[in-house]
From Swiss-Prot:
Family to which this protein belongs: Belongs to the globin family.
Subcellular location: Cytoplasm; Nucleus
Organism, as annotated: Homo sapiens
Effect of C83R: Decreased nitrite reductase activity
Its EC number(s): 1.14.12.-, 1.7.-.-, 1.11.1.-, 1.15.1.1
Gene3D superfamilies in alphabetical order: Globins
GO molecular function, one term: oxygen binding
GO biological process, one term: negative regulation of collagen biosynthetic process
Pfam family, one: Globin
Major subcellular site: cytoplasm
Activity control summary: The nitric oxide dioxygenase activity is activated by a reducing system composed of cytochrome b5, its upstream reductase CYB5R3 and NADH.
Disulfide pairings: C38-C83
Binding of heme b, residues: H81, H113
Protein name: Cytoglobin
Length: 190
């Protein structure tokens, strides 16, 4: 079963800590290596996200019907979105030294996803967790605890900025209806 955190998740604001200079450098160095394979890494992240959290596909008319991970990997629309996600993350990571720029970029992302796409903000937390999983796997032998903590701080920073943008636009959590699946869904058929 897929578990998607509910409304309390948004109310519990993540503690967002600034990254130290050493943490910024550690994240940026690892990110540079990941971003060298931007499209493939982005696709791996999104495929895992959609396989593990299929309810997230409801926001993507172009590939919400896809079940097969290989079909997802080959989808030009998914690949294009993966590049957009990686590009936004790249802008954030490259500008970790500039909190105003980070805030501005994440506010734009949050507002677009709230107003235009109507994406529940909890999916940003879920996606950032998937990103951390992929990073940990890619760098299993080179991911010391202090670097893991830096990435966890980055995750909190992203989520807090995005949810702040949702609150700024007056986001109200969507109530499940005929087109929006409930928070808990069976992961397979009957």
């Amino acid at each position: 079963m897929e578990k998607v955190p509910g409304e309390m998740e948004i109310e519990r604001r993540e503690r967002s800590e600034e990254l130290s200079e050493a943490e910024r450098k550690a994240v940026q160095a690892m990110w540079a290596r990941l971003y060298a394979n931007c499209e493939d890494v982005g696709v791996a992240i999104l495929v895992r996200f959609f396989v593990n959290f299929p309810s997230a596909k409801q926001y993507f008319s172009q590939f919400k019907h896809m079940e097969d991970p290989l079909e997802m990997e080959r989808s030009p629309q998914l690949r294009k979105h993966a590049c957009r996600v990686m590009g936004a993350l790249n802008t954030v990571v490259e500008n970790l030294h500039d909190p105003d720029k980070v805030s501005s970029v994440l506010a734009l992302v949050g507002k677009a996803h709230a107003l235009k796409h109507k994406v529940e903000p909890v999916y940003f937390k879920i996606l950032s967790g998937v990103i951390l999983e992929v990073v940990a796997e890619e760098f299993a032998s080179d991911f010391p605890p202090e670097t893991q903590r830096a990435w966890a701080k980055l995750r909190g920073l992203i989520y807090s900025h995005v949810t702040a943008a949702y609150k700024e636009v007056g986001w109200v959590q969507q109530v499940p209806n005929a087109t929006t699946p409930p928070a808990t869904l069976p992961s397979s058929g009957p």
